[in-house]
Amino acid sequence: MARAKFERTKPHVNIGTIGHVDHGKTTLTAAITMTLAALGQAVAKGYDQIDNAPEEKARGITINTAHVEYETANRHYAHVDCPGHADYVKNMITGAAQMDGAILVVAATDGPMPQTREHILLAKQVGVPKLVVFLNKEDMMEDAELLELVELELRELLTEYEFDGDDIPIVRGSGLQALDVMTKNPKTQRGENPWVDKIYELMDAVDSYIPDPERDIDKPFLMAVEDVFSITGRGTVATGRIERGKVKVGDVVELVGIRDTRNTTVTGIEMFKKSLDEGMAGDNAGVLLRGIQKTDIERGMVLAKPGSITPHTQFEGEVYVLTEKEGGRKTPFFAGYRPQFYVRTTDVTGTIKAFTSDEGEAVEMVMPGDRIKVTVELINPIAIEQGMRFAIREGGRTIGAGVVSKIVK
């Protein structure tokens, strides 16, 4: 069987904890797993197990990320928590841990801090659709009025970054108190402790406020071309991994990028040397194309549902520039810098025409380790869309990672 199906009874949602350092993200993550473990819907993870996050590589960049999973009555969740601020920045920009929504953790004792603002901005720019707020360390706040003020300030901040500040659920509680109760009595159920109930209240908010993600298979068809070859008597085959949607024999698809966009008809689909009627998201497939010569198509183009994606040469992006220690550049670069932009399956040369700091202030040069907004012009048009990830490379090594925030031309 080439296509065993993974059946899941509940919708799957990817989320993560974001927020300022020491505001209690990891403690809250541990508290969620321990609370839901009492219902048999999670494996309890202690703080240390989450804090010692393993290293992973995404787009040539090393990131520390902890993954936990748990279920509520309605959904199955994969949850990411990062130990360090730089890990969050890299994680969100590379899309290593795709988030369908996030829990913004804010310590009531501090209120919103610089990284709170930075994570909200990042979430907006990389396309995290919805946030739920956990106002942590409520046990350390005597003054109810002060709590109200912090909440008000948060709602204003969220609105400033175009989230729905008025409607976002803000749940007050204490991750530490809940974790403490669950550690002493791992069987504590809902209704037996006010701090544990706050965790349930938070999960109810996440369940109801963060929407079910659209599955890749329901999106318009797209496959980035990795390789091309001719089959005598049958025509030209493009191979690659189907990124989203599905494709059937007889479908008309568009060939987009590098050269003028053109239509062609799919006359065959193969996977594991067997022919299929239909290929779908996640499949590594070979697609036979009518009336296309081997010279008409090359790596870096995409096959897509007609009209679903267009070629562009200019875009704005959010970029993280690697430090020397991470394998990046030793020296700064200036406007006019010409690296390669690795998009899906190919390197395209482009120029970084202009850049600003993340908050939009003018900067003279970019240092390794900086996070910046860039305007890029590519030498060839490529199928690009908002939210798409790319790597920046120089002589074959990755020196930065980015996400497209806006198409210019």
UniProtKB/Swiss-Prot annotation:
CDD domains: EF_Tu (cd01884), EFTU_II (cd03697), EFTU_III (cd03707)
Enzyme Commission numbers on file: 3.6.5.3
Ranges where the record places region G1: 19-26
Subcellular location as annotated: Cytoplasm
Region (G2): 60-64
Positions contributing to Mg(2+) binding: T26
Pfam families recorded: GTP_EFTU, GTP_EFTU_D2, GTP_EFTU_D3
Binding-site residues for GTP, renumbered to this chain: 19-26, 81-85, 136-139
Alphabetical keyword list: Cytoplasm, Elongation factor, GTP-binding, Hydrolase, Magnesium, Metal-binding, Nucleotide-binding, Protein biosynthesis
GO molecular function: GTP binding; GTPase activity; translation elongation factor activity
Recorded family membership: Belongs to the TRAFAC class translation factor GTPase superfamily. Classic translation factor GTPase family. EF-Tu/EF-1A subfamily.
UniProt name for this protein: Elongation factor Tu
Organism of origin: Trichormus variabilis (strain ATCC 29413 / PCC 7937)
Lineage, broadest ranks: Bacteria, Bacillati, Cyanobacteriota, Cyanophyceae, Nostocales
Gene that this polypeptide is encoded by: tuf
